């Protein structure tokens, strides 16, 4: 039996609609109105991707969550943690990745964190370094392993992503293939 969300849609149908929403975010130019590097900006992205699909789209979670034995930031301290993350510097690639890792540890939403946060990361990279990650060249296995280890040491993640940076920040093919790859990381496959 397919897993369902609170509104009663299958995960596959949620992923398909959310992927459509992600493409529309870029095609419409709405991406240019997103706050860059802030919690509010991440909430805007999440709401855009998952609005109408999840009741909690764009809302900071109030429950504790874990994945694969890893507990994300305690809900009791989450808002305070997000303020501190938002204040982290974004001047260098290393600082940006450190901020990305902390946002991943915070995991502010009940679902859809990875897909939203990768778009958020690219916006921060684009604004500050005039680069984005060419996600289609980033191995799912290597990326997930690096993310799993990143709370202890983000060196592996930095090397993996730095090797796949591009200054072709407005290339639609790179953007859309990257979005599809991002959904693939989360288990989505067409068909």
Swiss-Prot record:
Protein's name according to its UniProt entry: Protein adenylyltransferase NmFic
Effect of residue 186 to G: Promotes adenylyltransferase activity
The enzyme's E.C. designation: 2.7.7.108
Keyword Nucleotidyltransferase attached: yes
Notes on how activity is controlled: Adenylyltransferase activity is inhibited by the inhibitory helix present at the C-terminus: Glu-186 binds ATP and competes with ATP-binding at Arg-118, thereby preventing adenylyltransferase activity. Activation dissociates ATP-binding from Glu-186, allowing ordered binding of the entire ATP moiety with the alpha-phosphate in an orientation that is productive for accepting an incoming target hydroxyl side chain.
Reaction(s) the record says it catalyses: L-tyrosyl-[protein] + ATP = O-(5'-adenylyl)-L-tyrosyl-[protein] + diphosphate; L-threonyl-[protein] + ATP = 3-O-(5'-adenylyl)-L-threonyl-[protein] + diphosphate
Residue positions of motif Inhibitory (S/T)XXXE(G/N) motif: 182-187
UniProt binding sites for ATP: 67, 104-107, 112-118, 140-143, 186
Presence of keyword Transferase: yes
Alphabetized GO MF terms: AMPylase activity; ATP binding; protein homodimerization activity
Uppermost EC category: transferase
Subunit structure, interactors included: Homodimer.
Positions carrying O-AMP-tyrosine: 183
Keyword terms: ATP-binding, Nucleotide-binding, Nucleotidyltransferase, Phosphoprotein, Transferase
Further information: Defined as class III fido-domain containing proteins, in which the inhibitory helix is present at the C-terminus of the Fido domain.
Pfam families listed in its UniProt record: Fic (PF02661)
Function, as annotated: Adenylyltransferase that mediates the addition of adenosine 5'-monophosphate (AMP) to specific residues of target proteins.
Post-translational modification: Auto-AMPylation at Tyr-183 in vitro.
């Amino acid at each position: 039996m397919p897993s369902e969300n609170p509104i009663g849609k299958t995960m596959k149908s949620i992923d398909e609609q959310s992927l459509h929403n992600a493409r529309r975010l870029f095609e419409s130019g709405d991406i240019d109105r997103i706050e860059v590097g802030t919690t509010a900006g991440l909430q805007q992205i999440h709401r855009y991707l998952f609005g109408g699909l999840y009741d909690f789209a764009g809302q900071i979670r109030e429950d504790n969550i874990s994945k694969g034995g890893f507990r994300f930031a305690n809900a009791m301290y989450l808002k305070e943690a997000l303020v501190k993350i938002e204040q982290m510097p974004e001047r260098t690639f290393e600082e940006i990745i450190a901020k990305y890792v902390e946002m991943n540890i915070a995991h502010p939403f009940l679902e859809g964190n990875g897909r939203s946060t990768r778009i958020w990361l690219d916006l921060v990279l684009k604004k500050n370094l005039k680069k984005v990650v060419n996600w289609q060249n980033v191995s799912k296995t290597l990326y997930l392993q690096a993310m799993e280890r990143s709370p202890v040491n983000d060196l592996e993640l930095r090397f993996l992503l730095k090797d796949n940076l591009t200054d072709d920040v407005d290339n639609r093919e790179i953007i859309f293939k990257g979005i599809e790859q991002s959904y693939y990381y989360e288990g989505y496959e067409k068909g």
